[in-house]
Amino acid sequence: MFFMSNKKELLWQSRFSEPFDRDALRFSSSVHVDKALFREDIEGSTAHVTMLAEEGIISEEESGQIIRGLREIGAELEAGDLVPHWEDEDIHTVIENRLKEKIGATAGKIHSGRSRNDQVATDTRLYLRRQIRTLGTALQGLQKTLVSKAETYRETIIFGYTHLQRAQPISAGHYYLAYFNMFRRDRDRLTDLLKRVNISPLGAAAFAGSTLPLNPARSAELLDFDGVFSNSIDAVSDRDTVIEFISVCSMVMMHLSRFAEDLILWSSYEFGYLEISDAFATGSSLMPQKKNADIAELVRGKTGRVYGSLITMLTIMKGLPLSYNRDMQEDKPPLFDTAETTIESVSIFGKLLEHTTLKEERLAKLTADDLSLATEIAEYLVKKQLPFRDAHRVTGRIVSHSLMSGTTLPGITLDVYRTFSELFESDIYAALKPEASIKAKKTHGSCSFDSVAIQLEEAKKLL
């Protein structure tokens, strides 16, 4: 096992007559955070060195030495045999110093035509690309679970809510597909973001380019980027792709948090619509009867962390003059935490959802004679040519009567209905059934069972 430290001179120290203060170095060191980028750093350096050799800036022999050394260092870091120390300042220094130990002075050629500015920007984009793809895959897995649930519960009737008040009976499948579409847009955002992320900044150097005959397009090709930077200042001095990634993650977490809130409410005794498997619930250390939806609550809580990271990044960048500033080093903690938190939240939420069951018998009883069928009365009258505003007014009076008399809407006699409007006939009772209400929906994308079946087929094609 190798423990790195700064017994050697820091990469930038030759211009200074005094050693860097140890407390200042400890304060500015980022290696404990950016060590997570070691794979991307080695990948970027390998491409850069390959390009340098192809352009004749270093020899093929030197390139081979450096690349072999980088591979060995990568294996050491992967296995935990090379342990970065805070005195090494950052992971880039760790790798270069270890390379020098392995191959000598040739290691110094790795940085020809390159600054840590474009090096870090490249590492960050490679990291973002990987995390975007990982998150996209996790979201796709969650969508598959949603499709499965929608298929299972396509004809299960639940309440649709507005203002957290029972509104209209709907298909449970329709509910699950609503979240499918929200996560579909989140995946679309990630796909669109990838177009901006997958542009190489390597070759911009510090910010003004280099006098060496670099070939940034070749470096980009080796790293599987779609293109190369247009402006060297812009390439190293913005973190808008980091901000955009965290913004997309914030929306993903917002959707998860809303979904989690429903599961928490529905699994409560007061609602009793849904059962969470014991494998995904916790109890109380004091109250033996408790069964808590902790996983859903944690997802809801972690949403705040991701929102906080977005504000952190916007605040870091808001007043920075061009081009690079050391403030930008602080982008790593919010970026890494956001990626890890969001991907883990999506993955665990999918597993949680798989282990939930709707209480169909209870839902059937609750939806059978509820006031949520009032809209059906209004639309019944509209079909009889009564203007909707008048139909709404009549229905409101019927609802008041139902509440005051303690009679359900299907329990009101025809004679009483006709005191509110002579348009009522015996066929009103056919409309006052949740299943009939759902089947009667005719509009595109509605909650009717047939519409949900169409939506399901579309969802499967998208997956």
Curated annotation (Swiss-Prot):
Pathway note: Amino-acid biosynthesis; L-arginine biosynthesis; L-arginine from L-ornithine and carbamoyl phosphate: step 3/3
UniProt-annotated location(s): Cytoplasm
GO BP of this protein: arginine biosynthetic process via ornithine; L-arginine biosynthetic process
Enzyme's top EC category: lyase
Keyword terms: Amino-acid biosynthesis, Arginine biosynthesis, Cytoplasm, Lyase
Organism superkingdom: Bacteria
A GO CC term assigned to this protein in UniProt: cytosol
Transmembrane segments annotated in the record for this chain: none
Short name of one Pfam family: ASL_C2
Catalytic function, reaction form: 2-(N(omega)-L-arginino)succinate = fumarate + L-arginine
The EC number(s) this enzyme carries: 4.3.2.1
PROSITE patterns for the chain: FUMARATE_LYASES
GO molecular function: argininosuccinate lyase activity
Entry's family note: Belongs to the lyase 1 family. Argininosuccinate lyase subfamily.
NCBIfam families (alphabetical): argH
Protein name: Argininosuccinate lyase
Source organism of this protein record: Chlorobium limicola (strain DSM 245 / NBRC 103803 / 6330)
